[in-house]
Amino acid sequence: MTRLRRLIATALVDSFGLSLGWTVFSLQITRSHGLAGLGLCNAAMLVGVALSAPVAARLSARLDGRALLRVTCVTEAALRIGTFALLLAGAPLAVVVVAVAASNVVAWTGYAGMRAEVAAADPRGSAMTWYMVAVAAIEAAGTATAAMLPTGPGGLVSGGLLVAVVAGYGACLLPTWLVAGGALVARAAPLPRAGGLRAVLRGGRLLPNGPPNGLLAFGGMVMLLGSGPTLLAVGLAAELHGTRWVAGSALAFAAGSLLAPLVVARLERRTLPPAVAWPALGIGMAGGWAFAAWSPVALLGAQLLSGMCMSALEGDMDARVATKAASPRGVTAGLATAAALRAFGSAAAVAFAPRVVAEAGVGWLGGALATSLAALAVLRLAGRWSRSAAGRGVGVATARDL
């Protein structure tokens, strides 16, 4: 078996166990603390994703690929099991939320290390694409499997089966420890201190020749307005149509994700500016949820649209960052910061969405978010047109002066 195939096989085992365990965890949270509790845990997860960018940069400058993967996989396994144990022991929700955030900082640091190993094993873009598609597909399978597990009187996985799920949640990282023995990635050179997310927040430049920082922030805003219902899909599907439809919801999202490359290719052919393309994708993410409560079929349609549009938005945004980078090091820093900004937007989305759903319903939320994204596109285009008109006016005046 080649190195790339071993890495993909490792990712399949880990991602299946992760998605199965996280889905069971999410259903437990929803039953114990409601959709608001699930929203807080998802927000903590996304904050962990965002914080993993600087952690990964620092660790990769101190550890080679083998050490980084082994340190993160052992730490993550302990945090996965510990977080589940805290929930089942009745720990305060705030403690569980902190544990979820910490677990995801470590998880996404390790995930960055795995992607670096994939690139080292096969630098072709198609290799990374296959890796990402394999992860997305197996995560959908894990979510669907969790939704179909036998449940106890409370409608939740319990007893010995629950113990097995929790144990597997941590043990599925064992292949990562083993594959780390053949790591190819050396310790990285330290990144310049001026780059990254901190530079964006201070108003500095993310990349020397990169896209405008406002463009990256705009992508985060689209995620804020468009991603909330999708990221709460496990809880929403269970509340709207029953636990069994969680499986179909996950599979519909995965099917939509497979269509995303076609959407991005069409956007590239039409050369649509982000001011139009990104809010349109956000409308696709949120708009279908306006009808998701009508029937299970409407739920599946909403998730199909969400998977297609969310994956396309992330792919298009990352492609714009990567093509503007002056060096591979710039690509890494740029992509990490773009992911962090998206994660912060999504964290805010899943924090406020449960309250709106509780008061007005998911249909109202989906419609309101889609309308807000349409208004955002109009405002963005109006700003572009006014700046363009001002530029033409200056050009005419200069010609006359000459």
Where would I find each of the regions flagged by the language model?
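C-terminal ends and interior cores of transmembrane alpha-helices
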Residues: 74-91, 281-294
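C-terminal transmembrane helical hairpin of 12-TM major facilitator-type secondary transporters
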Residues: 273-314
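Helix-loop boundary and gating motifs at the non-cytosolic
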Residues: 1-50, 202-253
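Hydrophobic core of transmembrane alpha-helices in multi-pass small-molecule transporters
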Residues: 12, 92-110, 220, 298-312
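Intracellular juxtamembrane helix-capping segments at the cytosolic ends
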Residues: 25, 108-122, 233, 312-326
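A late C-terminal transmembrane helix in Major Facilitator Superfamily
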Residues: 328-360
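Helix-to-loop junctions at the C-terminal end of transmembrane segments
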Residues: 51-67, 150, 258-273, 357-358
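Cytoplasmic helix-loop-helix junction between adjacent transmembrane helices
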Residues: 99-137
